[in-house]
Each structure stands twice: as C-alpha cells, then as structure tokens.
Amino acid sequence: METQMASPSLGRCSLWLLLLGLLLPSASAQALSYREAVLRAVGQLNEKSSEVNLYRLLELDPPPKDAEDQGARKPVSFRVKETVCPRMSQQPPEQCDFKENGLVKQCVGTVSLDTSNDEFDLNCNELQSVRRLRPRRPRLPRPRPRPRPRPRSLPLPRPQPRRIPRPILLPWRPPRPIPRPQPQPIPRWL
C-alpha cells in the first residue's frame, strides 16, 4: 500500500522535473552568444549599407566583463572588411573572401543578446591605412658615405674599323636613245 502512495508523488515530481528540463533549454536557446550577436549586427550592417560589396567580420574585441544579464544591451567593438561578394548576391559573408586592399571599418555600439530583440545601435567609421596609424620613428640624419676608391682603369680594346661595303660595279652600257616623234607634214590643201 505504501508503495502505491509513493508512486503518485514520485510521478508528480518526475513530471515537474521533465517540464523544468524542457523549459530550461528553450530559455537558454533564446540567448545569443556575444559573437553570434555581433554576426547578426554585421548582417544588418550589410543590409542597410549602400556599399557595393558585403562586409565580413575581421576582428572582434573581447566581450565586456559583466555578461550576467543576457537580455541587456551589451557594448561591442569590432572591425569589418570589404569582401569580393556583391551586396545583392545574397551570399553569407562568411563564405566570401576578403577583397585585396578592401575597405576596413571600425564599428562601435550596442547589441542585444536576446533573439527577440533585433535592434542594434552601431556606428562604423572607415579606418585609415595601417601604416599611418603606427607612430613614426624620428628620422635621424644619415651619415655621409665614405667616398669609394675609383677602380683602376683597364685598357680598353681598340675599336675595329667599321667595314663599309663596296658598291657593286656593273658593266657600262650606253643609254638607249629616246624615240622622238617624227614631224608630220602639213597638208597643202589648206
């Protein structure tokens, strides 16, 4: 009898555990990882961009330390680079190669890790060339090079006289006389 009484309470308890187990994965599935949220933001950047080509995530700065509240907006900082894929191709940017000497943009803003919230607040600015961002070393005057000793001149070979071809002589022939027209007699009956 005692076993039959414990059985309904055990069934209820297992039912509650089953329901709780089903609810927990769905709640955690709604929260995006920091990287996934940034990739969605890059997707929206590509949709709203007026550029010819798509942008792809180049570098992602580390996430903020206070990642406790999954629904709150999180500050993000990342860089995107222009790809070879046209924006109208509808191809995922991750499948596109970076464009050689493509445009690089630094993006700063906030994203939400909640899948139900698609709002992103981003500000992207074009980066200057990497060489320009590095500090320049002070230029010191270069020491003057020591004069090099002149090499000894070697005797140059004598130039060979240039051969001029001799004209080909043909046997001489007297010129032919040019035929001249004979004068016609004037008729007398005139």
Curated annotation (Swiss-Prot):
<dbReference type="GO" id="GO:0001530">
    <property type="term" value="F:lipopolysaccharide binding"/>
</dbReference>
<dbReference type="GO" id="GO:0045087">
    <property type="term" value="P:innate immune response"/>
</dbReference>
<keyword id="KW-0732">Signal</keyword>
<keyword id="KW-1015">Disulfide bond</keyword>
<feature type="propeptide">
    <location>
        <begin position="30"/>
        <end position="130"/>
    </location>
</feature>
<dbReference type="Pfam" id="PF00666">
    <property type="entry name" value="Cathelicidins"/>
</dbReference>
<dbReference type="InterPro" id="IPR001894">
    <property type="entry name" value="Cathelicidin-like"/>
</dbReference>
<dbReference type="GO" id="GO:0061844">
    <property type="term" value="P:antimicrobial humoral immune response mediated by antimicrobial peptide"/>
</dbReference>
<comment type="similarity">
    <text>Belongs to the cathelicidin family.</text>
</comment>
<keyword id="KW-0044">Antibiotic</keyword>
<feature type="disulfide bond">
    <location>
        <begin position="107"/>
        <end position="124"/>
    </location>
</feature>
<dbReference type="InterPro" id="IPR046350">
    <property type="entry name" value="Cystatin_sf"/>
</dbReference>
<keyword id="KW-0964">Secreted</keyword>
<dbReference type="GO" id="GO:0050829">
    <property type="term" value="P:defense response to Gram-negative bacterium"/>
</dbReference>
<dbReference type="InterPro" id="IPR018216">
    <property type="entry name" value="Cathelicidin_CS"/>
</dbReference>
<keyword id="KW-0873">Pyrrolidone carboxylic acid</keyword>
<comment type="function">
    <text>Exerts, in vitro, a potent antimicrobial activity. Probably due to an impairment of the function of the respiratory chain and of energy-dependent activities in the inner membrane of susceptible microorganisms.</text>
</comment>
<protein>
    <recommendedName>
        <fullName>Cathelicidin-3</fullName>
    </recommendedName>
</protein>
<dbReference type="GO" id="GO:0050830">
    <property type="term" value="P:defense response to Gram-positive bacterium"/>
</dbReference>
<keyword id="KW-0677">Repeat</keyword>
<feature type="compositionally biased region" description="Pro residues">
    <location>
        <begin position="172"/>
        <end position="190"/>
    </location>
</feature>
<feature type="disulfide bond">
    <location>
        <begin position="85"/>
        <end position="96"/>
    </location>
</feature>
<feature type="modified residue" description="Pyrrolidone carboxylic acid">
    <location>
        <position position="30"/>
    </location>
</feature>
<feature type="compositionally biased region" description="Basic residues">
    <location>
        <begin position="133"/>
        <end position="151"/>
    </location>
</feature>
<dbReference type="GO" id="GO:0005615">
    <property type="term" value="C:extracellular space"/>
</dbReference>
<keyword id="KW-0929">Antimicrobial</keyword>
<feature type="signal peptide">
    <location>
        <begin position="1"/>
        <end position="29"/>
    </location>
</feature>
<feature type="region of interest" description="Disordered">
    <location>
        <begin position="133"/>
        <end position="190"/>
    </location>
</feature>
